[in-house]
Design a protein with these regions (language model features):
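Transmembrane helix-bundle core of multi-pass membrane transporters
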Residues: 36, 40-104, 131-134, 153-162, ...
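Transmembrane alpha-helical segments in multi-pass inner-membrane proteins
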Residues: 143, 153-219
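Helix-loop-helix "hairpin" substructures at the membrane interface of multi-pass membrane proteins
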Residues: 10-18, 24-29, 33, 80-158
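Hydrophobic core segments of alpha-helical transmembrane domains in multi-pass membrane transport
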Residues: 19, 48, 52-53, 88-100, ...
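Alpha-helical transmembrane segments of multi-pass membrane proteins, especially transporters
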Residues: 14-22, 40-48, 132-140, 160-169, ...
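Cytosolic-side transmembrane-helix boundaries in multi-pass membrane proteins
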Residues: 119, 123-130, 204-252
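Membrane-interface helix caps of multi-pass small-molecule transporters
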Residues: 4, 23, 27-35, 54, ...
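Helix-loop interface residues and adjacent transmembrane-helix termini in multi-pass membrane transporters
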Residues: 8-9, 35-37, 104, 130, ...
Length: 252
């Protein structure tokens, strides 16, 4: 998108191309994970590596740094009288819409059901393969939109842009209450987790720490939360098992 805009192409065309690339990537991820049953983390990281290689080839390793100011203003302009940028307002509205879809529509609830127990969801008539496939497409489209806004906000795109963001995204989701095993959490919680992670980064800069600390702190937060989540799941399973044993004892 950045190279097309810098080359004078129509913005709408550039946006459409960016979204279509997201759809294609989502289809690839959905095919690999939902249909071929490949491990989601390994497969998506592999696709990420391929895309970074293709980006390097497409740009010939050069930075995209002559992005027009008018495009950068998209993420900088704010509503008159308030200090809220259109960038923030758009993200907030999109978060609320997706949250409402996932919690108040049948298809949205299917996503959580498949994440919680794919086999159980299949027994009640939900197609887990189709649900996962579509979910990967939607996630990739959201990532495309985020990439376009990142380009507008930063004003420069390098071959290393976005490196490490996947770990930050995972940490934000887990911090917001998303379970790595699926079926638990909400979009609102993930958004709050993202705000907290961003606040930590800004706080480090404000305190005079180098940005090199970001990855270490993000990794530490992720490890702590995952360990706590695992302990809570183990305790929950043990409690459920204990209740079942008590019920059987009473029946006997």
């Amino acid at each position: 998108v950045g190279t097309m805009i810098c080359d004078g192409k129509n913005w709408i065309l550039a946006f459409i191309v960016g979204i279509l690339i997201g759809v294609i990537v989502g289809c690839i991820n959905g095919f690999g994970v939902a249909i071929m049953k490949a491990p989601s983390l390994i497969f998506t990281l592999g696709v990420n590596g391929i895309l970074r290689g293709l980006m390097f080839i497409y740009t010939d390793g050069a930075d995209v740094n002559n992005i027009p100011k008018s495009f950068k203003d998209i993420s900088a302009k704010a509503l008159p009288g308030v200090r809220l940028t259109y960038y923030f307002i758009g993200a907030l509205i999109l978060t609320i819409i997706i949250h409402l879809i996932l919690t108040n529509t049948r298809k949205g609830r299917y996503v959580k059901a498949v994440g919680d127990n794919a086999d159980g969801a299949k027994l009640v008539g939900i197609n887990p393969v189709a649900t996962k496939f579509v979910s990967y497409i939607i996630c990739s489209v959201m990532a495309s939109i985020a990439g376009i806004l990142f380009c507008s906000r930063i004003g420069i795109v390098t071959t290393s842009s976005g490196n490490g963001y996947e770990m930050t995204a995972v940490a934000a989701c887990v911090l917001g209450g998303i379970s790595l095993t699926g079926g638990v959490g909400s979009v609102i919680g993930s958004a709050i987790g993202a705000v907290i992670m961003s606040s930590i980064s800004y706080l480090l800069v404000f305190m005079g720490f180098s940005s090199d600390y970001n990855d270490a702190i993000t990794g530490s937060i992720l490890i702590v939360i995952v360990v706590v989540d695992s302990v809570m799941q183990i305790r929950s399973r043990m409690k459920l098992r204990h209740e079942r044993l008590q019920a059987r004892t009473r029946d006997d």
